[in-house]
C-alpha cells in the first residue's frame, strides 16, 4: 500500500484523488473544481493554503498542470454528522492492541455520512493514536467487541489471523422463536454484495459463507441465538438468520429494507459480537476478549 505524504489530522487520514488518463483540463485545480463543483470555494482555499499536495508531499498551486494518472492528496472537510449518544468503553489496551466495546449505531470506519464520528476517527483523536487501524469490522448497527492495532508494523500480523480464519468469534442475536426449526444447524450459502448496493444476497453457487447456529433460550415468542461465524461475509449473520425465516429483531435491511432516521436510536439491531479468541502472533498467548454488553429477550 502506498503511504500517504500527509499525516493523520484530527483522527482523519488524507484523501487520495487520481488524475484522469487524459484530460481537457489544463490544471489540477480546474479538474478538481469541475469534479467537485459544490466544493469549489474550499478547494481554491485549500490550494492557496498549500493543503493540496502531490505524492511526494510538495504543495500544489493554482497553476500546477495535470499529470495523467498522478495522485494528489488533501484533507476532506467532514460533513455535519449525527452524534451517536453512546460510549465506547475500552476493554483492553497494550502496545499492540486496542479492544473496545462498540455500541450500536457507531460506524467502524469513515464511510458515507459517518466520517469524523466513526469509531476509528473518534478513538484516534481521543486516545492520541494516529496509527490506529481496525483489525476487522463490525456493521454500524452491530454492537460488541471490536479490535484495533495501535502500531502500523503489527497491523498485518493481526489482520492475517482473520484472513486465515484463526479467530473464534461468537455472536448473540434475538429473533422470533420458531419451534419447527431443527437446531443447532450449520448454514452454508454463497453470498454476494455488489458495490453501491445496500443489501447482500444469497445466490446459487459454491458456498462462501458458513455459520453455526444454536438456540440458547426462548420464552415461547422470542429466542436468544448463539452464532459462530466461520467466514466473514458482509451481513452474513443477518442474511443467514433471515434465510431460515427468523430475521434478527431491529434489522431494517432483511427481509425488506425500510428507512430509519439517523437520530432514531429506539430499536437497535439485536446482534452482539460477544467475544473473540485467538493465539497472539507475537507472544503466542491465547487471548480472549468479551463484551460487557448483553442482549435480552423482549418483555
Segments (PLM) and residue ranges:
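RNA pseudouridine synthases
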Residues: 1-299
